[in-house]
């Protein structure tokens, strides 16, 4: 009897929760968003971890299938992918976001100016992730209808 009640309660909670997700998706619709990271992560990469959490919260609210998210990284923001080489929590966050089709666009000017090799110095960056200019990429994406967010 108790088992049956628990089963019914769990089923009800699942149905109710799916209604909230559906309602949120209906509210927000399809979105194209660019997140801008050009700052240092601070102590224990707290600012970077906070930015990754903001992006995940956005995905949770709208649904990955309704989002196209790009993270443009330049200047001191390059530290997010440098730190992810050694900070397992940050690495896990970046990998999780990438698995949800979030792309990380890295500024070539920053790589050159900071003398960084993206293959050796940064976590999970490939040639196709490099953009000529982070700032120009931000402008370009906004012209294409991406909403700008700086976490």
Where are the model-predicted features located?
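Bacterial N-terminal signal peptides
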Residues: 8-16
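Acidic/histidine-rich, surface-exposed loop or edge segments in extracytoplasmic proteins
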Residues: 26-42, 72-76
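Histidine-anchored nucleotide/phosphate-binding helix
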Residues: 47-63
